[in-house]
Amino acid sequence: MVLLDSNHTHEHVLAELELYAPLVSKGSYCVVWDTGVEDLPDSMCADRPWGKGNNPKTAVWEYRRRLKDEGRKARDGGALNFDYDYTIEHKIAITAAPDGFLKRV
């Protein structure tokens, strides 16, 4: 399991995904925290380098697009594919990581 929660800019999180997501074992997770930034009012991130359109969720969307369009290999040599696991979001009801629970399939 890999948990990403540092700088929240799109480029930084995308780079983290490229580096660390390939380490995730099949059936395990890459969790990207604070994807909810995309859904916040601009005023909540006014003093930050991230905000709507430039955040962890947009990086997740871009990374999944790259996986689909370009493909990637995992560290174990298998194809790297992730699905959103909404069962976690539904169980906990409130989360800072909508679209951020990525299960390797």
Where are these regions (language model features)?
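Short SAM/SAH-binding signature in class I
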Residues: 1-4
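The substrate-binding groove and active-site-proximal loops of carbohydrate-active enzymes
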Residues: 7
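C-terminal substrate-binding/active-site "lid" region of AdoMet-derived donor-dependent transferases
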Residues: 10-105
